[in-house]
């Protein structure tokens, strides 16, 4: 087994070799919790959830840490607007984030540190940087990182200092020695949360927070650091500078994290989703209209490093495909019940190999679709199933569930999943499920009375509204086209 990942630091695909055999330490930058999470968060955290699931399925003992940033300028601004305590506001939105992640089927991290609970570690790390000459306190209560002291600054983002200096500036009131320097500690201001430090009361800067929490919960160096590609600069670039300067004499980026992975953006009409452009969707906005597993399935249809466009139409198509998969699983499990054990289908190992190759989820979904087409044809074949055919269907169902477990899909009873997906689709179309059920009952009565003209009229009227009836051994079910 060889797992290949695209490493942002080297801009190459590399074999993922943990520092300690059999174990892997992963840090993912979590959300700044000042509002409800958006589709970009959904994409990001579904990606890293699949990474964790696959690494564990491949036998690695993964320690997964993802933080909450609950001390930040945006949180303070939002809390002041609402007259609310910043930490309380952040805690409320952290709870909402958990609800959203649960709805998407994401596993919880092993550790979820919060900045507000790690102030002593942050202060100690800043003091270490000052002591080693990589940071300075100009005397106004702030502490800054001296960027030019770190020789590999910008290596991750492929930017040199000359390029960076053109866009750098010093804000009024700042006491930077160099426009490139960035804040590690910010002096207290009225109405802001503040903690004691050797430089006076204040609060940490954004970048130092993740460095401190990574070191506390994973040590240094770690195997893998991940997040959205918007974090490459400045956040991850600054994390490297801080963490390496505090812990290593070699001053190489690998002394903090051996591998770096980044996911692409969610776009609306080829533009990055943002509030300023008015094309912003929260996870809750979408889950009010679509099933959470359908959204997850949709997100996995694009390679994690690529940007992709979101639209209701494309998501609805993903929802339809997921329903079709569940329908096939239902048939395979029902028809293969009680069959003798059979060998694992070849598509399962092909799916594993695709995930080994930089977590190629769209390729996995393509492999699964091929296998489902074959299973569907076998299940729909007329006549009694032979013991061999039953065994093949049962093996397919087990394989589908195994691949689904790594992707975080196909984990519900088919009837439950199909009903949930159908009900969301019906609500979007303004279809009353209760009314449909009453029509089905009326049609059943007409058929019992051999009034087939009435029965057909009811079926056709429902079909005209996008409702498809399916007659089976257990009665009539329905779905929305």
Curated annotation (Swiss-Prot):
Matching InterPro entries: Cys-tRNA-ligase, Cys-tRNA-synt_Ia_DALR, Cys-tRNA/MSH_ligase, CysS_C, Rossmann-like_a/b/a_fold, tRNA-synt_1_cat_dom, tRNAsynth_Ia_anticodon-bd
Keywords: Aminoacyl-tRNA synthetase, ATP-binding, Cytoplasm, Ligase, Metal-binding, Nucleotide-binding, Protein biosynthesis, Zinc
Residues that bind ATP: 275
Motif ('KMSKS' region): 272-276
Chief place of localization: cytoplasm
An annotated Gene Ontology molecular function: ATP binding
EC number: 6.1.1.16
Subcellular location: Cytoplasm
Keyword set includes Protein biosynthesis: yes
GO CC list: cytosol
Principal EC category: ligase
Family: Belongs to the class-I aminoacyl-tRNA synthetase family.
Assembly and binders: Monomer.
Protein name (record): Cysteine--tRNA ligase
Native source species: Anaeromyxobacter sp. (strain K)
Originating gene: cysS
């Amino acid at each position: 087994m060889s797992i290949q990942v695209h490493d942002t630091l080297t801009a190459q695909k590399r074999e993922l070799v943990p520092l300690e055999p059999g174990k892997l330490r992963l840090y993912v930058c979590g959300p700044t919790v000042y509002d409800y999470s958006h589709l970009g968060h959904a994409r990001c955290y579904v990606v890293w959830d699949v990474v964790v699931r696959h690494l564990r399925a491949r036998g690695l003992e993964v320690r997964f840490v993802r933080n909450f940033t609950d001390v930040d300028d945006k949180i303070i601004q939002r809390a002041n607007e609402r007259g609310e305590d910043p930490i309380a506001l952040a805690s409320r939105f952290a709870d909402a984030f958990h609800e959203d992640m649960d709805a998407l089927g994401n596993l919880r991290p092993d550790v979820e540190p919060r900045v507000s609970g790690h102030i002593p570690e942050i202060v100690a790390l800043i003091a270490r940087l000052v002591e080693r000459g990589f940071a300075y306190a100009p005397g106004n209560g702030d502490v800054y990182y001296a960027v030019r002291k770190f020789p590999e600054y910008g290596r991750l983002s492929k930017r040199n200092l000359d390029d960076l200096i053109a866009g750098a500036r010093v804000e009024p009131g700042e006491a930077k020695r160099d426009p490139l320097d960035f804040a590690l500690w910010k002096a207290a201001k009225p109405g802001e949360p503040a903690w004691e430090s050797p430089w006076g009361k204040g609060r940490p800067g954004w970048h130092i927070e993740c460095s401190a929490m990574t070191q506390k919960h994973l040590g240094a160096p770690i195997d893998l650091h991940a997040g959205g590609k918007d974090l490459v600069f400045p956040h991850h670039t600054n994390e490297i500078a801080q963490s390496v300067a505090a812990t290593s004499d070699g001053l190489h980026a690998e002394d903090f994290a051996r591998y770096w992975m980044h996911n692409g953006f969610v776009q609306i009409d080829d533009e990055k989703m943002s509030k300023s452009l008015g094309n912003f969707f929260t996870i809750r906005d979408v889950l009010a209209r679509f099933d959470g597993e359908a959204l997850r399935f949709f997100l996995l249809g694009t390679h994690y490093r690529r940007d992709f466009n979101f639209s209701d139409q494309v998501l609805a198509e993903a929802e339809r495909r997921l329903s079709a998969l569940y329908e096939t699983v239902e048939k395979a499990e029902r028809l293969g019940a009680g069959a003798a054990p059979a060998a694992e289908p070849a598509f399962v190992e092909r799916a594993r190999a695709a995930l080994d190759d930089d977590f190629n989820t769209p390729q996995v979904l393509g492999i699964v679709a091929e296998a489902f087409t074959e299973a569907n044809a076998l299940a729909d074949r007329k006549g009694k199933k032979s013991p061999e055919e039953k065994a093949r269907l049962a093996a397919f169902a087990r394989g589908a569930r195994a691949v689904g477990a790594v992707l975080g899909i196909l984990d519900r009873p088919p009837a439950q999943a199909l009903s949930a997906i159908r009900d969301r689709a019906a609500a979007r179309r303004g279809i009353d499920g209760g009314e449909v059920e009453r029509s089905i009952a009326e049609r059943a009565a007409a058929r019992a009375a051999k009034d087939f003209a009435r029965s057909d009229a009811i079926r056709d009227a429902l079909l005209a509204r996008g409702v498809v009836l399916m007659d089976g051994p257990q009665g009539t079910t329905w779905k929305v086209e």
